[in-house]
Amino acid sequence: MKVVVVGDGAVGKTCMIICYTKDEFPETYTPTVFDAHKGNMDYNGKEVSLHVWDTAGQEDLARLRPLAYPNANCFLVCFSLVDRESLKSAYTNWRNELITLGPGNCPKILVGLKSDLREEFMKDENKRAQCVTREEGMKAKEDYTF
């Protein structure tokens, strides 16, 4: 099964993928150009092999991203829970890109990342306004049709 992960740069896509496929937590941030990882999951009692394609969120690499889209079985559209703009971008930028360039009837799942940083951000008055609230996340789940 081919899973393609998209979203703005630095929202946590690569970290999520490495945690899932290698059971490791990367301590440093390295922007991704393009990478592919393998993992397995149990689905209805059957082991399924996942091929997870990690794409660059940076605009200057936008021409490379669509190379990962053909034959995708699923897209994970990622945003950071500590960056409200990345949630808006999930709908305005990533939704439009997948509608235009992605396979038509492919499921798209909205994924909030960096939940481990929310508590720290909520304590800081300057950073608090950047956080996506639970209510906003639930509303996005209902409103953001892909």
Regions found by a protein language model. Name each.
Residues M1-V6, A10, C15-D23, E27, ...:
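Ras-like small GTPase catalytic G-domain
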